[in-house]
Swiss-Prot record:
Keyword Glycoprotein in annotation: no
Entry's localization field: Cell inner membrane
Protein's name according to its UniProt entry: Inner membrane-spanning protein YciB
Residues that span the membrane, as ranges: 20-40, 57-77, 86-106, 123-143, 156-176, 187-207
Organism: Brucella anthropi (strain ATCC 49188 / DSM 6882 / CCUG 24695 / JCM 21032 / LMG 3331 / NBRC 15819 / NCTC 12168 / Alc 37) (Ochrobactrum anthropi)
Species lineage: Bacteria, Pseudomonadati, Pseudomonadota, Alphaproteobacteria, Hyphomicrobiales
Length: 220
């Protein structure tokens, strides 16, 4: 039996089941924890001055990690409250945030939180590319897709996203290993999101080319 916490392929849901988060709120839930992370790292010393109890957590990057974990839990809780499901991608990312964030705070070593994007993106890339290797286009189970594509379209889109996730993992490794913590945090918030948006927009011609019309759906 499928556990209700995991979101099924939208094509298998009835209209009554498709309780969706409004687009602006969905964007806020995705960006909110990252903005909290950026603000806490950039203004950590100010926060510690105003709230001395926070000094026990440590340097700004550790305070940012703790608040990032809290904001991630809140975002997932809001999503669950509104839809009674959790999309696979935010759920897995949230679990990794909590695990690596806890290691960061426990061991007082920011390497763990810096490696979190590498782990998450490598995992998603490996799942998508591994699925293709076994003849499965798994993209529909990773994204809350509202569109329908033919088999070739799903294969191409899955390949592109799989390679893109691997690219993001490599970029994260290069940035955190060669630049300052502040530079890495800024790139994580203000670099990755624009890159992802541009990449997503570049996929629109492929999506339009391989979209199934109503006639295609009826025939299938």
């Amino acid at each position: 039996m499928e556990h209700p916490v995991f979101e099924r392929d939208p094509s298998q849901k009835s209209e009554a089941e498709r309780r969706e988060v409004p687009p602006l709120l969905k964007l806020a839930l995705e960006l909110g924890p990252l903005l909290v992370f950026f603000f806490a790292n950039a203004r950590g010393e100010m926060l510690i001055e105003r709230f001395p109890v926070l000094a026990s957590i440590g340097a700004p990057i550790f305070l940012a990690t703790a608040l990032f974990m809290g904001a991630t839990v809140i975002a997932l809780a809001i999503s669950w409250t509104m839809t009674r499901t959790l999309p696979i991608m935010p759920l897995v990312s949230g679990i990794v945030v909590l695990v690596f964030g806890a290691l960061t705070l426990w061991l007082h070593n920011d390497t763990f939180i810096k490696m979190k994007p590498t782990i998450v993106n490598t995992l998603f890339g490996a799942i998508l590319l591994g699925g293709l290797f076994f003849g499965k286009s798994l993209l529909g189970y990773v994204f809350d897709s509202a569109f329908r594509l033919d088999a070739e379209g799903w294969r191409k889109l899955t390949l592109r996203w799989g390679l893109f996730f691997i690219f993001l993992a490599v970029v994260n490794e290069v940035v955190w290993r060669n630049f300052s913590t502040d530079a890495w945090v800024s790139f994580k918030v203000w670099g990755i999101m624009p890159i992802t948006i541009v990449f997503t927009l570049l996929q629109m011609p492929l999506i339009q080319k391989h979209s199934l019309t109503e006639d295609n759906k009826t025939a299938s």
